[in-house]
Amino acid sequence: MKCHIYGYWESGQPSSSSDALLYKLIEEACGECIEFTTSLKDAELVILMPYLSSKIRRWALAQLYFRKNKEATYLLNAIFRIKSHQKVLAVTYENLDHRSWYWFGKLIRQLNIPRLTFWPDVIDSGGCRFPYWWNFVRFENYILSENAYERYGVPLELDRLLSPLDIPNQRIDAVCVLTRHLRWPRDQQLQSLEKNYQVDVYQHGTNRQWDKTKFELLQKYKYAFAAENSIGYGYETEKLPEAWMAGCIPVGHELNPFSDFRKELNQENDRVDDSCFANFGMLNNTPNLTKVVSYISERVFKP
């Protein structure tokens, strides 16, 4: 099946379906291998992502407002030139409650496009929850290329995420912070942490950078900064799983009401009790990929 990603975050298209867990789940749902094409008109399946120009965003919102009584197939063609015979699946790993991405959430909800987002069922019964960090977990039934795990250095192992932390003694007694910026509220979060911890900030473009993988750097530290950039219903990225995988105590984070992570991870004190992390794992259960496959099969590929 020929597939085109509209609004992909990189130039071009993925090299193969082994580049991400998402593509493997789509293949299972449709019962075919997918082949990526740079041609939108040749695609049988269009994966719609939000990384589009401001011009297209404004045009999309204008179409939603002035032609709100039109059918979804009409609007998809008017906005993106997606034809009625093409199958569509919207996928986003962004926080759709944030003002930068709210437009995309409004679009896919209003047009009732089949969608994979952070939103849990209680917020969006028409979509399916698919957190970004699932793409970096090693699942036995889905073999991915090594490139899929390049950003962190190793795959996230479910056994490790389900188990209590085992923290070696010989580690730097400080919080490791990996960040691209120190804009609000990131800077304020770190200032709060500095009242109780030594904080080592690694930031690209500064004198302190990391030349190895994130996993190798985190393994040197006892603590890791795991706060999200923004707050949204069900919005959880890879920060806490990556800290746990490296054997770091996660600090600086707040769990949202619809978290997949254990409620015991909630932090209410100025400084966490290190010993408590030996009593529980980060997760209660393994991610439910069967639910995702069934959703894609029913909403996208069912005649």
Question: Where is each model-derived feature located?
Answer:
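C-terminal "capping" alpha-helix adjacent to the active site of nucleotide-linked donor transferases
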Residues: 279, 283-302
